[in-house]
From Swiss-Prot:
GTP binds at residues 42-49, 176-182, 201-205, 270-273, 327. Belongs to the G-alpha family. G(q) subfamily. This is Guanine nucleotide-binding protein subunit alpha-14. Residues 37-50 are annotated as: G1 motif. It holds the Pfam family G-alpha. It comes from Homo sapiens (Human). The lineage of its organism: Eukaryota, Metazoa, Chordata, Craniata, Vertebrata. InterPro entries: Gprotein_alpha_Q, Gprotein_alpha_su, GproteinA_insert, P-loop_NTPase.
Length: 355
């Protein structure tokens, strides 16, 4: 009888394996719950891709020398895209070059096939430098709200000497400022305090938005980005629609979707640095007549824009968490995301057995 209680070595091993499998299954189930899905939304050029890059710098592996070298061609292409946009705008806005030689320089840049650019020739660099110094081009740059020009244009063009050196390797800031429109869906998972934050970036242009629907399952939080500086700009896809009006309408659509009833909403009012610069010469009241605050007042402008978005929320019980951000400033994003992470974890305490 006593012999029945004694397990053979094989049976003991079999039980051990079964117990291990059970433990692993429990761990897997727990791990599946320990993943947060953050959906990054917003209209085109609001800063979503830059924010993802910051997550890689702050919470991931960052950008090695080799990674940064991979952005060299894109930096060159951004420079040509910006300069060609200004050259075209010189014609449409009927601005004259002050230096006659710049008509020829403009032709040199016009002939460049941007998507085939992989280097900068000496002739091209000289043409870019002379054009950028021309008072006509500077006037054209000052009127950039009247056409489409990337926010990084001035950053790259004022630093053309550094970028044109043969040994040029893009810095972290160069990488953050590279503009490549997001097509399709980009996922970036990173681990924080044993919880996986899966950040999903989708294209913001209208043509990309129909792809969003597949991302809507089990979203923990929506992070919606607004470009504060777009209050006086029109859409790339439709030149008589105000960008901020489009963004505001999209925000209302997103927060009233049935899919997101249980998702927290975090609003990033981004590009605060550009707003501070622009509000000094482009008055908010010219584009939003309901604005009653003083001119050239950054705080009043920020508060007004925040309220515009808060007013889109029909459910007064639902809290919208808001932060003013500058997506190209790593310290700012590190600070803001620490607060966001705490908010998300607080809201999901029970799910992660933290209470």
């Amino acid at each position: 009888m006593a012999g029945c209680c004694c397990l053979s070595a094989e049976e003991k091993e079999s039980q051990r394996i079964s117990a291990e499998i059970e433990r692993q299954l429990r761990r897997d189930k727990k791990d599946a719950r320990r993943e947060l899905k953050l959906l990054l939304l917003g209209t085109g050029e609001s800063g979503k891709s830059t924010f993802i890059k910051q997550m890689r710098i702050i919470h991931g592996s960052g950008y090695s020398d080799e990674d940064r070298k991979g952005f060299t061609k894109l930096v060159y292409q951004n420079i040509f895209t910006a300069m060609q946009a200004m050259i075209r705008a010189m014609d449409t806005l009927r601005i004259q070059y002050v230096c006659e030689q710049n008509k020829e320089n403009a032709q040199i840049i016009r002939e460049v096939e941007v998507d085939k650019v992989s280097m900068l020739s000496r002739e091209q660099v000289e043409a870019i430098k002379q054009l950028w110094q021309d008072p006509g081009i500077q006037e054209c740059y000052d009127r950039r709200r009247e056409y489409q020009l990337s926010d990084s244009a001035k950053y790259y063009l004022t630093d053309i000497d550094r970028i044109a050196t043969p040994s040029f390797v893009p810095t972290q800031q160069d990488v953050l400022r590279v503009r490549v429109p997001t097509t399709g869906i980009i996922e970036y998972p990173f681990d924080l305090e044993n919880i996986i934050f899966r950040m999903v970036d989708v294209g913001g242009q209208r043509s990309e938005r129909r792809k969003w629907i597949h991302c809507f399952e089990s979203v923990t939080s929506i992070i919606f980005l607004v470009a504060l500086s777009e209050y006086d700009q029109v859409l790339a896809e439709c030149d008589n629609e105000n960008r901020m009006e489009e963004s505001k309408a999209l925000f209302k659509t997103i927060i009233t979707y049935p899919w997101f009833l249980n998702s927290s909403v975090i609003l990033f009012l981004n590009k605060k640095d550009l707003l501070e610069e622009k509000i000094m010469y482009s008055h908010l009241i010219s584009y939003f007549p309901e604005y009653t605050g003083p001119k050239q007042d950054v705080r009043a402008a920020r508060d007004f824009i925040l309220k515009l978005y808060q007013d889109q929320n029909p459910d007064k019980e639902k809290v919208i968490y808001s932060h003013f951000t500058c997506a190209t400033d790593t310290d700012n994003i590190r600070f803001v995301f620490a607060a966001v992470k705490d908010t998300i974890l607080q809201l999901n305490l029970r799910e992660f057995n933290l209470v």
